[in-house]
Amino acid sequence: MAVPKKRKSKSRANSQNHVWKREIVKQARRAVSLAKALLGGNTNFLLVSPGPTTPIKPNPKKQTGRRPRSQRRRT
């Protein structure tokens, strides 16, 4: 018979939500700061690498690690 999961305490849930929201706010501040720097022309501190000089080729078909049936050893 199925048993319901034990509920988390409200204080623990609030604590975890606070940590997640704090990380989101930190990332948002960094994004806004970078956008202001790029739009304002203050790019002396940014290291921007140029794009790749050669075109990127698509990866060949991934090998699954198994040989085709015709090439397998027979035991």
Swiss-Prot record:
GO terms for cellular component: chloroplast; large ribosomal subunit. It is found in: Plastid, Chloroplast. It comes from the Eukaryota. InterPro entries: Ribosomal_bL32. Residues 49-75 are annotated as: Disordered. The keyword Ribosomal protein applies. One of its GO terms (molecular function) is structural constituent of ribosome. GO terms for biological process: translation. Residues 59-75 have a biased composition (Basic residues). Keywords: Chloroplast, Plastid, Ribonucleoprotein, Ribosomal protein. Belongs to the bacterial ribosomal protein bL32 family. This is Large ribosomal subunit protein bL32c. The gene is rpl32.
